[in-house]
Amino acid sequence: MSRKKIKNPLIKRIPKEIIGDWKKYLVVFLFLVLTIGFVSGMYVANDSMLTSADEGVSKYKQEDGHFELKDKADSELVTAIESGEVKTAPDEKDSDSSKTPVTLYENFYRNEDEDYDADGKKDGTIRVYTKTGDINLACLIEGSFPQNENEIAVDRMHADNVGMKVGDTIKVSGKEFKVSGLIAYVNYSTLHEKKTDMMFDAIKFDVAMVTKEGFDRLDKSIHYTYAWKYEDEPADDIEQKEKSDDFLEAMVSQVMAAGNEVEDYTPRYSNPAINF
């Protein structure tokens, strides 16, 4: 005589449980769907932002680093620095550092007083660059790039924080400029005035672009900053650090031999305005 197969009691119980308390299970289901959707969306958005940032490095010609000299370098010194070779005295043995050839670009600026509400009082510091197509380009977010000596394009983040808009008139060290556009420089993801600053300041510090004629209107001292790009792009942060150390030794030796002085040295990997 064959045994009677015992049915699993859960077959009937589970559907009854769900139907009897469907509101609770609906809430749990919706919670899981929304959570999974939210987390997945964050990952997709993060990947998209990282891709855009990586593309921006090449599209807007981001520097591999920059240094500042006390005096403007002549063409002979520029060529010597670009060679990446360490300058040694005749009686000294050659350095052990590797030759690190680079291309240099002038990236001069002035730190001026900003009066964004034109009330005659200083509201902060504005770092003014000339319009260039060689290195550290700016993305135009609104308006237009400056076209004449009386126009200026300012950082979009700073403008949003202080209520500045396209068409406003601001004063830069007492001289009036019309805001032609809002921009974002590729080397200023955040508004760090100095590499030693622990936190950026998007209210008291601004970066801006003017024409060459507009730059000549200003009076504060020029910072002779040179941005560089390696001829052979480093594969990772470790190689970037090694190249930076070798280039620093070579650059300093050439600058000292020319009777000039290094005021600042900031490779890209240690620049908080880029990597914050």
Which ranges hold each PLM region?
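Membrane transport/envelope proteins' first extracytoplasmic loop
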Residues: 2-276
